[in-house]
Amino acid sequence: MRHCISVLGAGSWGTALALLIARNGVPTLLWSHRREHAEAMAAERRNAHYLPHATFPDTLSVTPDLAEAAATASDAVLVAVPSHAFRATLDLCAPHLQPEAGLMWATKGLDRTRGCLLHETAREILGPDRALAVLSGPTFAAEVVAELPSAITVGASSEAFGAKIVSWLHNAYFRAYTTDDLIGAQLGGACKNVLAIAAGISDGLGFGANARAALITRGLAEMMRLSLALGARTETLMGLAGVGDLVLTATDNQSRNRRFGLGVGKGRPREEIHAEIGQEIEGILAARLIHELAGRKGVDMPITAQTYRVLYEGLPPEEAVRNLLLRDPKPEWDR
């Protein structure tokens, strides 16, 4: 059976996007890499593990077969897997993609193998002509599924593909804006996860609202420095994919990255925090990859650097904060 859209990844965000598109009347296929999970969703008509209260409409089907999901998508494939699985997922589905099907992704992070942006990975695997787009912005899956008002940025390689995506997503409670700035849309989504961990650590240490606001604001400044160095535009980082996603993820406890940081700040064992959250914490890998990318590009990202040291070098969180405060005074914005 042909579908307009196949969504690869049946976690909370992949399922939420599949539900959004299917509720808009677009035939959609949702792929899970675990056969037992796919079979349970097909039988129960819901994703009991992640979004148990959302019933699947008739326009949403489920499969455990990645080749089927790729081959039957006539219009586009939407990848919603963790960043560490992005390259492998594309490698596996690439031989089966329809020639005219575009590629979208809602994954927020960098390529673990090369440390590059995900559109570079997609171009490497799929070639230069495939329509590409990234979905990024301040969206929690549970709120989208509950049909609470939400908005995102669609960074698309062509105006026509961006308009198509908006037609699949847009409705009375979900608004999508387009941009051709794929770099800014991707880096906003990747950097904010690291900064959300930093904000969580600060709150876990009990440093208060002033410190949180300073971390968010200065975090935005270093996110912008890296993004502009890579060719992004300022307005993208000041929009939904940048400041919007950063504020949401750094301040609300629905954020897995923020909750992880809270636990670290309170001195809890990492394994215990991971087990309690039970899902991917993208900011951990992103802290290393973004820190390394900033080093290659000569971009100063002090909050990211101290977060990296806490996560990978065992630096006590209190010392990381002290290192940030003891930096030499400087103008707020570079000239």
From Swiss-Prot:
InterPro entries, per database record: 6-PGluconate_DH-like_C_sf (IPR008927), 6PGD_dom2 (IPR013328), G3P_DH_NAD-dep (IPR006168), G3P_DH_NAD-dep_C (IPR006109), G3P_DH_NAD-dep_N (IPR011128), NAD(P)-bd_dom_sf (IPR036291)
Keywords, sorted A to Z: Cytoplasm, Lipid biosynthesis, Lipid metabolism, NAD, NADP, Nucleotide-binding, Oxidoreductase, Phospholipid biosynthesis, Phospholipid metabolism
Reactions it catalyzes: sn-glycerol 3-phosphate + NAD(+) = dihydroxyacetone phosphate + NADH + H(+); sn-glycerol 3-phosphate + NADP(+) = dihydroxyacetone phosphate + NADPH + H(+)
EC number(s) given by UniProt: 1.1.1.94
Sites where the protein binds NADPH: 12-13, 33-34, 108, 141, 256, 282
GO biological process, one term: carbohydrate metabolic process
Top EC class, one word: oxidoreductase
Gene3D superfamilies on file: N-(1-d-carboxylethyl)-l-norvaline Dehydrogenase, domain 2, NAD(P)-binding Rossmann-like Domain
HAMAP family membership: NAD_Glyc3P_dehydrog
Positions with a binding annotation for sn-glycerol 3-phosphate: 108, 137, 139, 192, 245, 255-257
Protein's name according to its UniProt entry: Glycerol-3-phosphate dehydrogenase [NAD(P)+]
Associated pathway: Membrane lipid metabolism; glycerophospholipid metabolism
Record localization: Cytoplasm
A molecular function GO annotation: glycerol-3-phosphate dehydrogenase [NAD(P)+] activity
Domain of life: Bacteria
Role noted for this protein: Catalyzes the reduction of the glycolytic intermediate dihydroxyacetone phosphate (DHAP) to sn-glycerol 3-phosphate (G3P), the key precursor for phospholipid synthesis.
NADP is among the record's keywords: yes
First-listed, main subcellular location of the protein, grouped into a coarse class: cytoplasm
Native source species: Methylococcus capsulatus (strain ATCC 33009 / NCIMB 11132 / Bath)
Keyword Nucleotide-binding recorded: yes
Active site annotation, chain numbering: 192 (proton acceptor)
